[in-house]
Amino acid sequence: MKRNHTRTKRTVAALALAAATAVGLSACMPPGYYGASGTLDNGDQKSMHVVVFNGWDEDTAASYLWKHVLEEKGYDVQLTNSDVAPAYSGLASGDYDVVFDTWLPNTHKQYMDTYGKQLTDLGSWNEQASLELAVPEYSGIDSIDELKAHASEFGNKIIGIEPAAGETKVVSDQVIPQYGLDGMDFITSSTPAMLADLKASIAKKEDVVVTLWRPHWAYDAFPIKDLKDPKGALGKNEEIHTIAKKSIEDDFPTASKWMSDFSMDSDTLYSLENALVNSGAKTSEYPAITAKWASEHQDYVDSLTSTK
């Protein structure tokens, strides 16, 4: 009996210790953490996988912002960079949960046509988006229809971004043939390379024409202007949408509601883009930079998860 009594006391003590440990751990967990089951107390899965388009700075800004916001709420958020086509394929298959940079109705139409039935559109967060051909303010032309006659002044080159980008297809399939620019070389590589070329040309006060888009921090950083597009080859103004996997509202009922209410004007976006992309910081420094920016824009950040 004594041995059994001792065992009982040890069992009670062990259970008490386990309970105390659980309470102690829960006190240390981020708000919303539920436990090891992989879910939060708001009904959402704990882990979210965000895909980020290579070279799209507004996507980088929005993705790091939401990573910060969600991790403050107890989520684990993984960001993965990808070219556009495999990003949509990954969303359709459920390998990724969400992307914050789908331009509609034009730029990413082909991907929505292909995968739209396997995706969920959580709505637009910026309605001031547009594709542009931009030149330095000192350039002597103001419209794309003047570019052919002045092509030699621009080295017979249009400097583009990633080959798989939606804007690249628009320029190649619409702008170049409509304005008779087939005699110019359309150079594609990456957004950082395009921006480096733009910066170097302006430093030398040389003419250069680049593919660009609004909103983008380059408009604050460089003396540039958009060329008028009288033929409308670049398309009308667009909206930036948050597109997610089909099951997003089942897997993340709370976060998907926050994201469907997400809104960010261009000035606020420029501010975060400048802090991240135009600061010369390493990617590893982006979380800390975003946290600092968030503390300086706390009312806005808090509004992203407020009940509306």
Protein language model features and the residues they cover:
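A conserved helix-loop-strand patch within extracytoplasmic ligand-binding domains
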Residues: 117-164
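Short, well-ordered beta-strand elements
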Residues: 43-58, 75-80, 155-159, 259
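An extracytoplasmic/periplasmic, membrane-proximal ligand-sensing/linker region
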Residues: 45-48, 58, 174-184, 188-205, ...
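C-terminal motif of bacterial Sec signal peptides marking the signal peptidase cleavage site
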Residues: 21-27
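Bacterial signal peptide processing site
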Residues: 29-32
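A bilobed periplasmic-binding-protein/Venus flytrap-type ligand-binding module shared by bacterial periplasmic
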Residues: 130-140, 238-253
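Ligand-binding pocket segment of bilobal, Venus flytrap-like solute-binding proteins
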Residues: 96, 100, 170-232
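Short helix-initiation/N-cap motifs at beta->coil->alpha
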Residues: 54-57, 78-90, 186-197
